[in-house]
Amino acid sequence: MAIWRIINRSYLKYASNQLTRNYYTQVCLASSTHVVKQTTKLSSFDIPNSDICTRPSNIFQNLRFLATSAQTRKKEAEVDSDGPRLNEKITGDYVRLVSEEGHCVVSLREALRRAKELQCDLVEVQRDAKPPVCKIVKYSLELYKKAKVGKERAKAKRAEAIRPDIKEIRFTPKIEAKDLKFKSDQALKLMESGYRVKCLAVPDKDKHKELEPEKLLELLFRFTCFIGDALVESWPEADRKGAVVIVRHAKFGPPKKGGVKLMKDIDIKSARVKEESPKPDSSKAGVATVDDQEDIEKSEPRFSVEQAQPVKFQNAYAKREPSSEFSGGRDASRFEPQSPNQHVNPQRPRFSNQAPNQQPTGRFDPQSPNQPPSAPRPQFPNQQPTGRFDPQFPSQPPRPQFPNQAPNQQSTGRFNPQFPNQRPSPPQSRFPDQAPNQQPSGPSPNRHPDRQGPPPRFQNQAPNQQPTGRFEPQPPNPPRAPPRPQTRLPNETSNEQPTAPGRSSGPASGYGIFSTPKTK
């Protein structure tokens, strides 16, 4: 009976728990369909015999674990492929430690302790072994040694191949034996490095002359005696500008083209000498050589002083007729010599007022004294003649310049006012030996008697007026009489104030309209 009661109680509790769980799930679904916001919190404390929290779902965890296993393996492989693992990156409880004394199996912790004491790294040498093999070394030093070995291998491999570049060594005949030996050592080093060497013998630059090819070849073979074991790649050649040969080291093998030939086996006579291009014949070009000049001097006839004749040159203009441009000009006589009995045609005048046979000379052409003077043209509209007058002809009297001037009076360059009661002063003579009223007997001594003054250059200019270049004042109207002093009548009173005995009669000092009179 007791057992039955226990079973009924447990069954009733289980049934009640199932009913309450179904009820809550239906309420949640109904609230979601009607879009009603209700917060229902189900807790395991409210449902003591609930199995929701006690049953973990491992299905999704197992699926995630299966998906990431392949990815983790790839990452580990990438890390391991970079290089050996060091120190703490080594996995495993035990390792086989290799040293100079031998090898033994120790724990990983013991191997790390030993590496730390020696200040080195614990490097995993073989990972696939069980247990993995490790070694205590300095990892940075091992990397340096490995890189150095790689460089040496690359250098040795490069030294086995010939380089395409060509190095050149040049020397001149004035080089000494020790310098020639030094250059040969340089050539050997270059050939061992894989270069082909071009040996060039050239003449001295300071002498500026070319040597014979045989001398340059002799100098070249003196140099090649120091490198006799070298292979000849290009056969020796020589000319007046230099001798050249190209050699290479024997360890690189013979060249592809041509046979094997050592430098020491080559004879100097077998070298090729370039022929010079023929020079143009100097006799055909019109240039005489030294031998030709000697022959000319020997064959040249020698004349005595009596037989000497002047050298005649051919006149290129003897048979040429002058053009019409020079037929009537002043240069016609330069091209056509005329005999004294030959009739001369009148020349065409170059100007409108020129005589038929008159030669134009320059700016001023003198005229004969019997020719009448041309009409004067004033320079300016209101211009009067200047004070200086040079008579053109002896019989022509000068004209007065001013209305009150005497006929024979000479005007000066300045104005002298005269008063009515003053006597007119006699005119001053221009020359020291001339009387006051004496007329000049001839033209000015500075002028030629047969020459006439130049024609006026301006429209209103007088015939003999000289333009001065500066303005000269003209005389105004008749001068006024000087002012007479004022006379004061005896009964006339003055408006002046009497001055004090101690004061002067001058104007009183003040400051104009702003000054105030002083009151006593």
Swiss-Prot record:
Location(s), subcellular: Mitochondrion
Residues annotated as transit peptide in the record: 1-66
Basic and acidic residues bias (residue ranges): 271-282
One Pfam entry name: IF3_N
GO cellular component: mitochondrion
Compositional bias annotation for Polar residues: 336-361, 404-422, 458-468
Bias (Pro residues): 369-379, 473-485
Keyword terms, alphabetized: Initiation factor, Mitochondrion, Protein biosynthesis, Transit peptide
Top-rank taxon, per record: Eukaryota
GO molecular function terms listed in the Swiss-Prot or TrEMBL record: translation initiation factor activity
Stretches the record annotates as Disordered: 271-520
Protein purpose: IF-3 binds to the 30S ribosomal subunit and shifts the equilibrium between 70S ribosomes and their 50S and 30S subunits in favor of the free subunits, thus enhancing the availability of 30S subunits on which protein synthesis initiation begins.
Quaternary structure, from the entry: Monomer.
Stated family: Belongs to the IF-3 family.
Identification of the protein by name: Translation initiation factor IF3-1, mitochondrial
